Amino acid sequence: FLFAFISHFAYNFCFGISMIPFRDSILNQTSVIWALFCAALALYVDDDSRRSFPLKQWQKIVLLVLLCVLAFPSDWSCFPVLCTLHIHKNRGNLEKQMLGMMLYISMYVIVWCLAIDVTYGLVQYGILIVWPFMHFYNGTRGNWRGMKWFFYFFYAGHLFLMGILRILLYGNVSTIVG
């Protein structure tokens, strides 16, 4: 949650979005880290072995829908939640993981192409570059524990630097559709 909060300000600064959520739009109001936080919660809700208390199926569905709604205003909307659950449910089957991810990403692309911008929508297929990384991943955590922290700081840091570059090149204008 803390890194989603920190990344919110870096993301909004990067793209010239108001720091106050929902001031201009409901779309792209915060970074993908918020949606990934919701995805982590969704894994907890969905995986009975991780909880010390039972949830009925209808309770899981309600909570998962709520997490998708909470993730909706972020970059990538609810799709990180859906893709994460799909990848987890198909653990060990890369073909099913990629097919499901492709279907979810295609829904996202279609919405963007029809409602906002075709080019930006099609660029989202770049996420498929993850396939080789998933293909060669052996399922074990690496030795360097600092990678997680490096990623969080790199993510917020690069957004902050891109925000400075945006201001230097274009002035204080919004550069994202929202």
Question: What is each residue range found by the language model?
Answer:
Residues 1-178:
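Alpha-helical transmembrane segments and their immediate juxtamembrane cytosolic regions
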